[in-house]
From Swiss-Prot:
InterPro entries: CofD (IPR002882), CofD-like_dom_sf (IPR038136), Gluconeogen_factor (IPR010119). Residues 317-359 are annotated as: Disordered. It comes from Mycobacterium leprae (strain TN). GO terms for cellular component: cytoplasm. GO terms for molecular function: LPPG:FO 2-phospho-L-lactate transferase activity. Gene3D superfamilies: CofD-like domains. Required for morphogenesis under gluconeogenic growth conditions. This is Putative gluconeogenesis factor. GO terms for biological process: regulation of cell shape. Belongs to the gluconeogenesis factor family.
Length: 359
């Protein structure tokens, strides 16, 4: 489905099951897909490992690796192994094998990106899976509706607590504030010809990416086509009762000046012309064109990877004339707002394998 002469480079940002479906769609267009994954999970196996070992939470990273695993029997076998979760009631209960592998390799190699690259080689991944930041983060949120007075906000900290809150999330922040972006993630965004944000948990998987200064600067600077994929339904907890337009408003509030070219939404989510016109008006906040297409798996609130791939290919071909950024432009991207970022053609080989610039 890739048009002749088009560089096959797709970057997908997100986390959890939303990112998994985007990666499953993107790999139908090209084997060279880069996943940039949130690193604030504090529940389940990931929460235990980050608390006990101080590692980047591996759960969403593991799922992204499984989504991009080779279709060979060997690749699929290792994807199954990676996802296998121990049962029982002992110390290993609830831990997926892949989480333990990534945690162990991160300690051995002293670099989470190198650990991901090594597991990716085992799986036959031709693209790359990267954490959005090289350190574990926390999310905190201002939530209303938990007190008798609806004007009073309560501070809720932690991804699991925010995702399940019965209140209304008003704003989220990352801790530490203004965290550094993973250098290879910035490189990948700058080298891409299509960047996809969403679908997924809006406040805990989508918005965190635009709260990392280095990432949002790269997203603004890249020549890639930028697409936002909206959820098929408002999720329970953090976005319960949200309209489609409200999702766009809160994204724009968290990242002033951030824009996308295209917004993809399932046609059945916005069935009548009045609602579609309201969404088009809201999309002007992001300077985006809205595409009403069939991307749902029949009878479910899940995206169909094949249909989503068709939709992504449709917006991708709108960027055929874009050229790759210059080295000078890439060097201006800052990882933490303090020091310039080395460009995609900058020196390599001075650190662990995972610290090499992406090729």
């Amino acid at each position: 489905m890739i048009s002749p002469g088009s560089p096959p480079s797709i970057v997908a940002l997100g986390g959890g099951h939303g990112l998994y479906v985007t990666l499953s769609a993107a790999r139908r267009l090209t084997p060279y897909v880069t996943a940039i994954v949130t690193v604030a999970d504090d529940g389940g196996s990931s929460g235990r490992l980050r608390s006990e070992l101080g590692v980047v939470p591996p759960g969403d990273l593991r799922m992204a690796l499984a989504a991009l695993a080779s279709d060979s029997p060997y690749g699929r076998l290792w994807a199954t192994i990676l996802q296998h979760r121990f049962g029982g009631s002992g110390a290993l209960a609830g831990h997926p094998i892949g989480n333990l592998m990534l945690a162990g390799l991160s300690e051995v190699l002293a670099d989470p990106v190198a650990a991901l690259d090594e597991v990716g080689r085992i799986l036959g991944v031709k693209g790359r899976v990267l954490p959005m930041c090289p350190i574990a983060l926390q999310i905190e949120a201002d939530v209303s509706g938990l007190e008798a007075d609806p004007r009073i906000f309560r501070l809720i900290r932690g991804q699991v607590a925010i995702a399940s809150t019965p209140g209304k999330v008003r704003r989220v922040r990352l801790l530490p504030v203004d965290p550094p972006a993973t250098r290879q993630a910035v490189d990948a965004i700058m080298a891409a010809n299509l960047v996809v944000l969403g679908p997924g948990s809006w406040f805990t998987s989508v918005i965190p990416h635009v709260l990392v200064p280095g990432l949002v600067t790269a997203l603004r600077a890249t020549t890639a086509r930028r697409a936002l994929v909206l959820n098929l339904a408002a999720g329970p907890g953090e976005t319960a009762g949200f309209s489609v337009e409200r999702h766009l408003h809160v994204l724009a509030q968290h990242a002033p000046g951030f824009t996308v070219h295209d917004i993809i939404i399932d046609a059945d989510r916005v069935p009548n012309n009045r609602e579609r016109e309201q969404l088009r008006r809201a999309a002007t906040l992001l300077q985006a064109e809205v595409h009403f297409v069939d991307v749902a798996r029949p009878g479910t609130s899940l995206h169909d990877p094949g249909k989503l791939a068709t939709a992504l290919d449709g917006v991708r071909v709108g960027n055929q004339d874009s050229s790759a950024p210059t080295v000078a432009a890439t060097e201006q991207i800052r990882l933490d707002g303090k020091r310039p970022q080395t460009g995609v053609n900058g020196p390599v080989g001075k650190g662990p394998r995972g610290d090499d610039a992406w090729r």
